[in-house]
Swiss-Prot record:
GO MF entries: ribosome binding
Pfam families (UniProt xref): PRC_RimM (PF24986), RimM (PF01782)
Protein name: Ribosome maturation factor RimM
Function field: An accessory protein needed during the final step in the assembly of 30S ribosomal subunit, possibly for assembly of the head region. Essential for efficient processing of 16S rRNA. May be needed both before and after RbfA during the maturation of 16S rRNA. It has affinity for free ribosomal 30S subunits but not for 70S ribosomes.
Cysteine disulfide links: none
Origin superkingdom: Bacteria
HAMAP family: Ribosome_mat_RimM (MF_00014)
Self-association and partners: Binds ribosomal protein uS19.
GO cellular component: cytoplasm; ribosome
Family membership noted in the UniProt record: Belongs to the RimM family.
Compartments, record wording: Cytoplasm
Residue ranges occupied by any PRC barrel domain in the UniProt entry: 100-178
Length: 178
């Protein structure tokens, strides 16, 4: 799975510009992709901050520690780079690589109903957490839920029995009392 939050405008957020790097207009980018340099595979970025949108071309980039350093077309100095701080880096969802069968992007799982083997509704996937060992579904109660408890369910083969995107449902093997 890949942790990628989707948006209603057909874009997916893959990173965020955090600050400037040096004096020649480069920016530091926190990448949400795994590995982080996958973000550099996209030549054109849509930068988004609130209602503001800006199309920009990636000239080059490189990993530096836990961040990326990127040179963007038309950004030639520190002031231009500073003006881009806090912009989200987005690309069209349609440009994401196709996944193998049984693999999903996080944005595809968010909002799905979670039911147990008996069909009892636990709630809907609010978001996911990356723990290192495995990803975790954060399931929040919704209308018709079994109870009002938030549940953290491991995204493992033992727990997740089936993901049905068409039906909007994830079937799990999980004790309702746990």
């Amino acid at each position: 799975m890949d942790m990628t939050p989707a948006s209603a405008d057909g874009l997916i957020v893959l990173g965020k510009i955090t600050s400037v790097h040096g004096v020649r207009g480069e920016v530091k980018v926190y990448s949400f992709t795994d590995p982080i340099d996958n973000l550099l595979d996209y030549r054109f970025w849509t930068l988004r901050r609130g209602d503001e949108r800006r199309q920009i071309e990636l000239v080059r980039g490189r990993p530096q520690g836990r961040l990326l350093v990127a040179r963007l077309k038309g950004i030639e100095d520190r002031d231009g780079a500073r003006a881009l701080a806090d912009f989200e880096v987005c690309v069209p969802i349609a440009q994401l690589p196709r996944l193998d069968e049984g693999e999903f992007y996080w944005h595809q799982l968010e909002g799905l109903r979670v039911v147990d083997r008996e069909g009892r509704l636990f709630g809907k996937v609010d978001h996911l957490l990356e723990t290192g060992a495995n990803d975790v579904l954060v399931v929040r109660p919704c209308t018709g839920s079994l109870d009002d408890r938030e549940r953290l369910l491991p995204y493992t083969d033992q727990c997740v029995l089936r993901v049905d995107l068409a039906a909007g449902e994830i079937r799990v093997d999980w004790d309702a009392d746990f």
